[in-house]
């Protein structure tokens, strides 16, 4: 990329992370992303893509497949194929637009937005995908998971599965389904907190999508949550290994059958934290796992009795 073009892009980019307000931002031109080095949030993902998303094995194939512009994305209602007009009052080279021309540019932007979103269906899709992006940013999920979420949501729209349900609940259910599809654990509680949508509504919408779209998602296990919960509790690898060993033994004895995976994982971590000399209270673990202290206490009693584990509480 020419130096002047790169400077123009950098001048339009945010200077501060909207999540943690850090100014330590990293520009990844290869992937077209602006990333916060402190919290890991992807602040922008629409920089010019300089590399192809295809492979070519000879020069003829390379010429046939050559293209200009960003690759298609499900995260935009028009799949990223339309032209974008920036809202900053600067031109391509980063120079400020004269005051006498700003009113004209504003009218062009306004009509451009109207043309891009021309009917109610496109307007609703645009709002839903913006919401999906916002929730995804709060959860810290990568772009490929957001793409999968957007694809699931689009399929739900095509099959008219949103009728009678809120857009917010279907968006949240799509994110939850996408996370389960690639085995990236995100609990309903986490998604509910990030979206401010009722947990029960998300669960109901998810079951509706899973059935109607035939998602065939594997059930989650306690192993899916152990590393995530331990990291949030600042527990090391040793605690993770012990927690997984406890869960493995509990599952082999049938203790986990019919029980929620997050509750089993939370109880195992509670035991492991004491064993490694870094005890965490049931209240602390309940807060990060999204299960109640009563659930952790009940699972802990069942596991410790079956495995003959004794710890000083």
Swiss-Prot record:
A Pfam family it matches: Zn_Ribbon_TF
Cited SMART domains: CYCLIN
Keyword Isomerase: no
GO MF term set: DNA-binding transcription factor activity; TBP-class protein binding; zinc ion binding
InterPro entries: Cyclin-like_dom, Cyclin-like_sf, TFIIB, TFIIB_arc, TFIIB_CS, TFIIB_cyclin, Znf_TFIIB
PROSITE patterns: TFIIB, ZF_TFIIB
Extent of the Sequence repeats: 130-213, 224-305
Gene3D superfamilies: 1.10.472.170, Cyclin-like
Annotated residues for binding of Zn(2+): 17, 20, 36, 39
Positions of TFIIB-type zinc fingers: 13-44
Function according to Swiss-Prot or TrEMBL: Stabilizes TBP binding to an archaeal box-A promoter. Also responsible for recruiting RNA polymerase II to the pre-initiation complex (DNA-TBP-TFIIB).
Family: Belongs to the TFIIB family.
Protein name per Swiss-Prot or TrEMBL: Transcription initiation factor IIB 2
């Amino acid at each position: 990329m020419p130096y002047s073009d790169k400077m123009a892009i950098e001048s339009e980019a945010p200077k501060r992370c909207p999540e943690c307000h850090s100014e330590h931002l990293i520009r990844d031109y290869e992937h077209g992303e602006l990333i916060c080095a402190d919290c890991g949030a992807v602040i922008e993902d629409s920089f010019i893509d300089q590399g192809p998303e295809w492979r070519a094995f000879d020069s003829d194939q390379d010429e046939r497949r050559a293209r200009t512009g960003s690759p298609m994305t499900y995260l935009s209602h028009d799949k990223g194929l339309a032209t974008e007009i920036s809202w900053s009052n600067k031109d391509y080279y980063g120079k400020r637009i004269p005051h006498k021309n700003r009113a004209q540019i504003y009218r062009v932007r306004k009509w451009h937005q109207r043309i891009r979103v021309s009917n109610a269906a496109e307007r609703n899709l645009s709002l839903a995908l913006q919401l999906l992006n916002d929730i995804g940013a709060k959860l810290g999920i990568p772009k490929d998971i957001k793409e999968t979420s957007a694809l699931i949501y689009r399929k739900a729209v095509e099959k008219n599965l949103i009728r009678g349900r809120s857009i917010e609940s279907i968006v949240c259910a799509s994110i939850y389904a996408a996370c389960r599809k690639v085995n990236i654990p995100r609990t309903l509680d986490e998604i509910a907190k990030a979206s401010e949508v009722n947990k029960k509504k998300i669960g109901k919408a998810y079951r509706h999508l899973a059935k109607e779209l035939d998602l065939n998602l594997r059930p989650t296990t306690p192993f899916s949550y152990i590393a995530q919960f331990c990291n949030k509790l600042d527990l090391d690898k040793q605690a993770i290994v012990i927690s997984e060993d406890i869960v493995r033994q509990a599952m082999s004895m049938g203790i986990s059958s019919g029980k929620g995976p997050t509750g089993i994982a939370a109880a195992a971590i509670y035991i492991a934290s004491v064993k490694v000399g870094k005890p965490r209270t049931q209240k602390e673990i309940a807060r990060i796992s999204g299960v109640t202290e009563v659930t952790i206490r009940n699972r802990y009693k069942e596991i410790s009795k079956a495995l003959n584990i004794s710890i000083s509480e």
